[in-house]
Amino acid sequence: IEPDDYRTPPLGCDIQGGIADVAWFFQCADNRCITSHPNPDDSFWIRHFGKDALPYGHSWNLDALYENLSKESSSRRAVLFNHRDCYNPPCVICYQFQSTIHGVLDCTVTLRSSDVAKVLPQDVFMSDLILAWICRTNGFEPGKMTFNLANAHVFYQDMEYQEEFTIDFGD
């Protein structure tokens, strides 16, 4: 993935970590990869959260997505999700792709939970990398991205202006 492949990343995202994690995602999407990250020092998730148990190394049905897009580019079944994690889903549940008649591929990302201050910029950047890769390998131009956030939250310690939001109820 080259810098020309993706749009300007949101402020606060880790470009190197995002590229490392998305490369691992695609390398492991067909179950032929070890489940531990090959470059943990580069991983955004491992460096920031200490997690080496990400939902990579398992099937995200990438082959089925490519098949759907190649058979019928306007397929409503062009969905990328990890069916093995349906009872313990990661924050990003799925990526749904929809193409236009002009060869543009849009992506809707559904998150069951979103840490807006710390993690959402990284999710946006990594989702854009995933869209760029899917487009490049399937002959589309990247289109718009839509994010559906459930349980969007900001942790108090991550707020830049905590004092402005502190309520003193007195005694």
Language-model features: locations:
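Terminal, non-catalytic protein-protein interaction segments that mediate quaternary/complex assembly
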Residues: 1-171
